[in-house]
Amino acid sequence: MRVSLSWLKQLVQVTDSVEALAHRLSMAGFEEEEIEDLSARAKGVVVGFVKDREKHPNADKLSVCQVDIGSEESIQIVCGAKNVRAGLHVPVAMVGAELPAVNLTIKSGELRGVSSNGMICSLSELGLATESDGIAELDALTDELPALGAPVAPMLGLDDTVLELAITANRPDGLSMVGIAREVAALTGSALTLPVLTLKPAHELLQASAASAEAMQAGGLYGITLIEGVDGSQVSPTWVQQRLERAGINRVNAVVDITNVVMLEQGQPLHAFDADALEQLTGKPVNAASFGLRQAREGEAFIGLDGRELSLVARAQVVTCHDLPIALAGVMGSKASGVTAATGRIWLESAMFSPAAVRTTARSVGLRTDASARFEKGLPKEMTLACSIRALELLKELFPCEAKGLWVCGDSAADASSVLLRRNALHQLLGPIEDEEGSSDLADAVVEQCLTALGSELSPSDEGWNVIAPPSRRLDLAREIDLIEEVARLVGFDRFGAHLPDPLAPGALTPAQQAERRLRTLFCGAGLQEITTLSLVSASDSDPRIAISNPLLAETSHLRTNLWEEHLAVCVRNLKASQPGCWIFELGTTYAGSADAVEESRLLSGVICGEQRLERWTTSGKPAPPDYYAARGRLTEVMQALKLDVSDRRLTDDSRLHPGRAATLVLEGRPLGCFGQLHPELAASQNLPEATFLFELDLTRLVESATRRNRWVPAFKAFPTVPASERDLAVVVDRSQAASDLMQSIRKAGKPLLEAVTLIDRFEGDQLGENKASQAFRLRYRHQSETLTDDQVQPVHDKVRNALVKQHGAELRS
């Protein structure tokens, strides 16, 4: 919001310097983004008079001018403007002047051999227009010219300062000069001199269709006024032009400019339709009942005031006349119904549209205007019709116009319910004020002064005050805590002492949080990088997903059911970026069930794809992606560090994984997840290398097991003092038989003397038979206190051999 200081001073008494005022507003929540001194645009520019103009001797398009600037001697200036001539009063930039609008410093010099000691300026060079056809003719801009040599800034309206403030979403009142004036008055205690408004003007009922009436009342209010006797060709008076220029709004004509001035002053957007153009557009007589409000039809054509041709979508809301769209509700009017130089009658629209509907409409066409920015934040219903009367009064100052009627659909009265502000709640939350005399609770008189300064109505109660917020703040001051915040803001947050709870309890991580942190550290130590993927994904025909009600994009319209799909996409992006590999993991949540009963699952998922990001000197410069066992070993390292005994069980029915290189991971006798090489068909479809490995674990179960009591307590054992006895055992089993199952049977049968068992060899060949394989194990036996003899070892070893034969149908080879 650009705030003109001179306009602000007409609404409220300002005694602070502009810097002090900006600081006050920033501390109160309206952050100052820029302070622009408009006089800097014309610093060093004075009023001059062209006494004589001659053609340049060496250039057809240049003129040599003798300019009187009130000094004893005239100065010579070479000018290239077509409209320069003798007898004109012009703005003259003296040597040394800086023109920030065009980033130019004026210097003495020669143009085609003729000296020039200054520059005659155009309005664009002074920052008063986007483009200019020639130099500024001061005679046409004002009837009272300053003395020659006087600064030109005051007569051009550049004797002002503009504050640019950042307005937060909860303060729509800050998007109006009246709102800023009220804020300044509340902060400084200064008196207000606001325009007097007619809050409840006489009006008739707008007889709209049932559908339109429902849409209008859903938004809040719709008013339309017929005004005759305006002149669309008339240029706005200087004060209107200056207010618009300082606010950064382009001038159009006197009618449109007045609607924009009212919007800047009161915060209520207005729109003027050309009454005759509407009748020509629709081919029918137009009255108040001709106007309507509906959703756009898919593909409906619309040309806005900016000339853009739009194809509307059904979620956009349009204002209609005889069912033809004439405006995007709350955003922009149509070009065909806009005010032109031929306009003599207008329909003036003053409405309150639904913030959500305006936001949806603006987003659907990719257009955000000054009007839509205000509607989106919410407006007070009480001010809607009053602003149309305010615009009518300003139009009457310019034209001999007359209102033929005001028609309204909806109730202009708003619910002015009170909010109870409890004295104890205010003191408990804010604490005492600290000053040189000590600390004390905020006095009732100060609280009442703050709330009254905002325009609130107060009535005392046993507990404190019943507060009715002013219309402009009713959306913001809806709860007790909002009122307490306002009091603190106006008094000054820095004046309240700190009163933190005492004593402060030290924070600590839960065992589950510690386990997750350790998991992250261990995986990073194993060479993997943690990532975080978006939990919102697109719809899938093959994988039912829970839809969200208000998606921003179709690609983020559903909750994810897995992590691995996005992980593969991350790998693809990294490999396309010429990375040698992508080793990643994530601790994330997936969602299943329905919108009424969402089931959340915590997963640990990851992918090992390609080479680890290390130097190749260890592999003689050759690529060395991990094989199945190397990749599985990374996961084993992490599980062993957490003291978790995870075993593998053959997995063949997971369509994502290679049927011969996949395993179900088992923890404490129950499946924990899976690990395996990506299925060749899936890897090829994703353009991933064949040696891509995927793992997915139940994070909740993993953390539960890792946080069991004494799980991380180191168990110290004495070094063995007696030798071990080792025996090798080779058996022929089915080719599909997992070594882990055999080893589990060996451990169970070899108790208590068996200390360790290791797979040392696996062999397949025709001599063993079809679908047969030989697996060899090394068994280590040891007693805690004595050396074992063959007579002690052999019975246990025979027990192991018999268990393999009985449980797995093994054929003994040794």
Curated annotation (Swiss-Prot):
<dbReference type="InterPro" id="IPR036690">
    <property type="entry name" value="Fdx_antiC-bd_sf"/>
</dbReference>
<feature type="domain" description="B5">
    <location>
        <begin position="414"/>
        <end position="498"/>
    </location>
</feature>
<dbReference type="Pfam" id="PF03484">
    <property type="entry name" value="B5"/>
</dbReference>
<keyword id="KW-0648">Protein biosynthesis</keyword>
<dbReference type="InterPro" id="IPR033714">
    <property type="entry name" value="tRNA_bind_bactPheRS"/>
</dbReference>
<dbReference type="GO" id="GO:0004826">
    <property type="term" value="F:phenylalanine-tRNA ligase activity"/>
</dbReference>
<feature type="binding site">
    <location>
        <position position="476"/>
    </location>
    <ligand>
        <name>Mg(2+)</name>
    </ligand>
</feature>
<dbReference type="GO" id="GO:0000287">
    <property type="term" value="F:magnesium ion binding"/>
</dbReference>
<keyword id="KW-0820">tRNA-binding</keyword>
<dbReference type="GO" id="GO:0009328">
    <property type="term" value="C:phenylalanine-tRNA ligase complex"/>
</dbReference>
<feature type="binding site">
    <location>
        <position position="486"/>
    </location>
    <ligand>
        <name>Mg(2+)</name>
    </ligand>
</feature>
<dbReference type="Pfam" id="PF03483">
    <property type="entry name" value="B3_4"/>
</dbReference>
<dbReference type="GO" id="GO:0006432">
    <property type="term" value="P:phenylalanyl-tRNA aminoacylation"/>
</dbReference>
<comment type="subunit">
    <text>Tetramer of two alpha and two beta subunits.</text>
</comment>
<dbReference type="InterPro" id="IPR005121">
    <property type="entry name" value="Fdx_antiC-bd"/>
</dbReference>
<dbReference type="InterPro" id="IPR005146">
    <property type="entry name" value="B3/B4_tRNA-bd"/>
</dbReference>
<comment type="similarity">
    <text>Belongs to the phenylalanyl-tRNA synthetase beta subunit family. Type 1 subfamily.</text>
</comment>
<keyword id="KW-0436">Ligase</keyword>
<protein>
    <recommendedName>
        <fullName>Phenylalanine--tRNA ligase beta subunit</fullName>
        <ecNumber>6.1.1.20</ecNumber>
    </recommendedName>
</protein>
<keyword id="KW-0963">Cytoplasm</keyword>
<keyword id="KW-0479">Metal-binding</keyword>
<keyword id="KW-0460">Magnesium</keyword>
<keyword id="KW-0030">Aminoacyl-tRNA synthetase</keyword>
<feature type="binding site">
    <location>
        <position position="485"/>
    </location>
    <ligand>
        <name>Mg(2+)</name>
    </ligand>
</feature>
<feature type="domain" description="tRNA-binding">
    <location>
        <begin position="39"/>
        <end position="153"/>
    </location>
</feature>
<dbReference type="GO" id="GO:0005524">
    <property type="term" value="F:ATP binding"/>
</dbReference>
<dbReference type="InterPro" id="IPR012340">
    <property type="entry name" value="NA-bd_OB-fold"/>
</dbReference>
<dbReference type="InterPro" id="IPR045060">
    <property type="entry name" value="Phe-tRNA-ligase_IIc_bsu"/>
</dbReference>
<dbReference type="InterPro" id="IPR020825">
    <property type="entry name" value="Phe-tRNA_synthase-like_B3/B4"/>
</dbReference>
<dbReference type="InterPro" id="IPR041616">
    <property type="entry name" value="PheRS_beta_core"/>
</dbReference>
<keyword id="KW-0067">ATP-binding</keyword>
<dbReference type="InterPro" id="IPR005147">
    <property type="entry name" value="tRNA_synthase_B5-dom"/>
</dbReference>
<dbReference type="InterPro" id="IPR004532">
    <property type="entry name" value="Phe-tRNA-ligase_IIc_bsu_bact"/>
</dbReference>
<feature type="binding site">
    <location>
        <position position="482"/>
    </location>
    <ligand>
        <name>Mg(2+)</name>
    </ligand>
</feature>
<keyword id="KW-0694">RNA-binding</keyword>
<dbReference type="InterPro" id="IPR009061">
    <property type="entry name" value="DNA-bd_dom_put_sf"/>
</dbReference>
<dbReference type="Pfam" id="PF01588">
    <property type="entry name" value="tRNA_bind"/>
</dbReference>
<dbReference type="InterPro" id="IPR002547">
    <property type="entry name" value="tRNA-bd_dom"/>
</dbReference>
<dbReference type="InterPro" id="IPR045864">
    <property type="entry name" value="aa-tRNA-synth_II/BPL/LPL"/>
</dbReference>
<dbReference type="GO" id="GO:0000049">
    <property type="term" value="F:tRNA binding"/>
</dbReference>
<feature type="domain" description="FDX-ACB">
    <location>
        <begin position="720"/>
        <end position="813"/>
    </location>
</feature>
<keyword id="KW-0547">Nucleotide-binding</keyword>
